[in-house]
Amino acid sequence: EITTEPEGTLESMINANLYSAYHTTRGLITIMKENKTGHIFNMCSIASFTAYSNGGSYAISKFAMLGFSKCLRAELKGFGIRVTAVMPGATKTESWDGTDEPEERFMKPEDVAEAVFSAYSLSPHSVVEELLIRPQLGDI
């Protein structure tokens, strides 16, 4: 909950989930523009477009990441650079360690990777702008 988060949580989440991608991408865009090719995948989240209780700073940072992805798409499409916002739901990673949720409520990381590779494998004439992947049993 936003009102009970420790001081500095928002800054930490923005640093991890937005600024790191922002600065890395800025460092690579020049060469992508020169080559007139490239594909940027930004790891967003279901939290990028769906607010939920206890989402707090994490959700805020992921909303920002989706906005960043949309800006990049608009700015770079004329250079042949594709941009995909990847928005996975609950995926069985370390962030869910200790949860009581049964394993079938989660996607496998390999499923997300395969979906990303499928988007990457399209011809240069197509782009998956937003890749939304959810567990078969729905969001947690």
Predicted regions and their residues:
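Active-site helix of classical SDR
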Residues: 25, 61
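C-terminal helical subdomain
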Residues: 78-81, 85-86, 101-140
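Short, flexible catalytic-loop segment of classical short-chain dehydrogenase/reductase
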Residues: 88-98
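A short helix-coil junction within the Rossmann-fold of NAD(P)-dependent oxidoreductases
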Residues: 27-36
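Residue(s) in the substrate-gating loop at a strand-loop-helix junction
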Residues: 45
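Active-site loop immediately N-terminal to the catalytic Tyr-X3-Lys motif
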Residues: 3, 52-56
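Catalytic Tyr-X3-Lys loop
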Residues: 3-22, 37, 41, 65
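Active-site-adjacent segment of SDR/Rossmann-fold oxidoreductases
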Residues: 32, 50, 71-81
